[in-house]
């Protein structure tokens, strides 16, 4: 059995997990998430735990077993606690401003770069160089944070750009002078 897949998932108080055919929906204090489980995998909810099982040891079943268990565990954590990612903007003149629910970045281009959050994602600005992305869907939070980072990737020579909080940028030496 999959080492990850065979572990039961405990459901915290205030979170409700329901299985309807191949759809698993998780409802909690922060919202509701739904996931469609692939064919060979079965999900059973009993007395405060969720158990994911597979019918056979075929390669596809084994790979989907641990994946499904992790996705359901992430959904449960998302609706109970939520997920956040923090980004830092480093560089002279690089800054971010909140414009309503959207953000406007100054990243060294000749124009400001607007960025609007998709549904289910909250963007907040601390100071003028820190952005916090938060939401209940782990995948969506990570994807939005990656999109913001891709607006100006960190430069390997000076380290300027948008980076995750705590991210170490590999620096390169400049040209050797004569």
Curated annotation (Swiss-Prot):
Keywords: Ribonucleoprotein, Ribosomal protein, RNA-binding, rRNA-binding. The keyword Ribonucleoprotein applies. Part of the 50S ribosomal subunit. It holds the Pfam family Ribosomal_L6. Gene3D superfamilies: Ribosomal protein L6, alpha-beta domain. Belongs to the universal ribosomal protein uL6 family. One of its GO terms (molecular function) is structural constituent of ribosome. This is Large ribosomal subunit protein uL6. GO terms for biological process: cytoplasmic translation. GO terms for cellular component: cytosolic large ribosomal subunit. This protein binds to the 23S rRNA, and is important in its secondary structure. It is located near the subunit interface in the base of the L7/L12 stalk, and near the tRNA binding site of the peptidyltransferase center.
